[in-house]
Amino acid sequence: MKLTATLQVVVALLICMYNLPECVSQSNDSPPSTNDWMRTLDKSGCKPRDTVVYLGEEYPESTNLQYNPRCVTVKRCSGCCNGDGQICTAVETRNTTVTVSVTGVSSSSGTNSGVSTNLQRISVTEHTKCDCIGRTTTTPTTTREPRR
């Protein structure tokens, strides 16, 4: 019985040594530090982050088109603001292009005349700078480049 308990302790120590950063960070023996707080604040703050956006929502007027992939990853503002009356909002944006496969159904006089699929570059808005602003403040608008 002692051998089994000893082996369990040894295995636990080996696992902990292999994952040393996780074992140390989960320890509550040391008091919280300003550096810990700053890391937490930085991780949760208002800033551009990788965000998955659905192309159908980016181009709602294109109901006869299907995109593949259906979604892409771009930077969008997200995070926590200190005040309850504030929201993390884009203050600078830019258009970026992504290449997708677009399938469209063309119709003539109400009848389906064909399905076509081709690769296209389309424009998606990406946030480059974020700020916490009052909820009543208007957000900047970005003009969308025409699709090619």
From Swiss-Prot:
Record: glycosylation sites: N95
Main location: secreted
Gene Ontology molecular functions: chemoattractant activity; growth factor activity; vascular endothelial growth factor receptor binding
Signal peptide residues on this chain, from the entry's feature table: 1-25
Domain of life: Viruses
Keyword match Disulfide bond: yes
InterPro entries the record matches: Cystine-knot_cytokine (IPR029034), PD_growth_factor_CS (IPR023581), PDGF/VEGF_dom (IPR000072), PDGF/VEGF_growth_factor (IPR050507)
Protein family per UniProt: Belongs to the PDGF/VEGF growth factor family.
Subunit note: Homodimer; disulfide-linked.
Protein's UniProt name: Vascular endothelial growth factor homolog
Organism: Orf virus (strain NZ7)
Taxonomic lineage from the root: Viruses, Varidnaviria, Bamfordvirae, Nucleocytoviricota, Pokkesviricetes
